[in-house]
């Protein structure tokens, strides 16, 4: 399995993206958390099209956790991961507040994964096959773990799986990038008609600086994106670019 080619990564939250400060398996409260930056760093090296957090939170239905207290914590984890990875990878999440094991969205049932992949396709127009997805979690049925629900979720959904410890111990290559035009998302070619892709971040940065200085017109702006990035469809009711560029100058 080559995880550098996985376009969508589903990932558990408790014990995977975050740990308890108290050291207990389950948090004593919404405050009992710390980010697992070693996992964040590995995800950034992969730069998939999306990282989608899927989390069982049956304690909400049981009355152990108030949803008004949990939701800001969930949003905080999503925002931290989005900020760390960068804007070219979508970060989103869904949690199941129900404790009923038969509920279609409670892991190991694949409802959350099915929903989020469908929503990703709806919002971007990009179809991702299940074999191009990966699930990462800490409930792998290994010795000392409380269950195998994350592993079974991947099996029920139909994608590959990695335990979070195995994931963090992997030697991953540095991510590669391609240079695109902002106007249409197409890969830029050099003077010899070779696409500017499979570049390190420093190489991609140098290319963008050179192209921008050589083509100062606004319609010739460039940027670099991860190799797995694809052009999403245009959102509904998107404003159309004006033929004439209007510059706003402050009053003196």
Language-model regions: role of each:
Residues 1-52:
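Active-site neighborhood of HAD-like aspartate-dependent phosphohydrolases
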Residues 27-35, 65-73, 107-108, 145-149:
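Alpha-helix N-cap and loop-to-helix initiation/capping positions
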Residues 39-74, 89-102, 136-139:
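Substrate-recognition element of Asp-dependent hydrolases with the DxDx(T/V) motif
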Residues 61-84, 106-119:
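Short, electropositive alpha-helical surface patch
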Residues 105-148:
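Conserved Lys-Pro-Asp/Glu-containing loop-to-beta segment of HAD-superfamily phosphomonoesterases
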Residues 134-173:
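Acidic, Mg2+-coordinating phosphoryl-transfer loop and its flanking beta/alpha structural elements
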Residues 173-196, 211-213, 222-226:
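Short aromatic-glycine-(Arg/Gly/Cys) micro-motifs in beta-strand/loop hairpins
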Residues 194, 201-251:
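Short, mixed-charge low-complexity intrinsically disordered segments
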């Amino acid at each position: 399995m080559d995880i550098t080619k996985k376009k969508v990564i589903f990932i558990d939250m408790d014990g995977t993206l975050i740990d308890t400060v108290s050291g207990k398996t389950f948090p004593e409260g919404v405050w009992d958390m710390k980010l697992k930056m070693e996992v964040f760093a590995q995800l950034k090296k992969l730069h998939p099209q999306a990282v989608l957090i899927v989390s069982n939170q049956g304690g909400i239905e049981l009355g152990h956790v108030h949803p008004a207290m949990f939701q800001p914590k969930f949003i905080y984890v999503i925002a931290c991961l989005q900020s760390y990875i960068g804007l070219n990878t979508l970060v989103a999440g869904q949690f199941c507040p129900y404790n009923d094991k038969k509920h279609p969205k409670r892991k190991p049932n694949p409802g959350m994964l099915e929903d989020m992949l469908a929503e990703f396709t709806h919002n971007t127009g990009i179809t991702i096959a299940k074999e191009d997805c990966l699930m990462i979690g800490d409930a792998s049925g290994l010795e000392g773990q409380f269950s195998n629900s994350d592993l079974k979720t991947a099996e029920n959904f139909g994608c590959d799986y990695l335990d979070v410890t195995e994931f963090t111990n992997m030697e991953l290559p540095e991510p590669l990038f391609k240079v695109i035009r902002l106007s249409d998302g197409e890969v830029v070619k050099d003077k010899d008609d070779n696409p500017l892709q499979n570049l390190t971040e420093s190489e991609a940065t140098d290319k963008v600086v050179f192209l921008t200085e050589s083509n100062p017109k606004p319609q010739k702006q460039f940027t670099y994106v991860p190799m797995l990035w694809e052009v999403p469809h245009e959102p509904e009711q998107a404003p159309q670019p004006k033929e004439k560029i209007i510059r706003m100058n402050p009053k003196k």
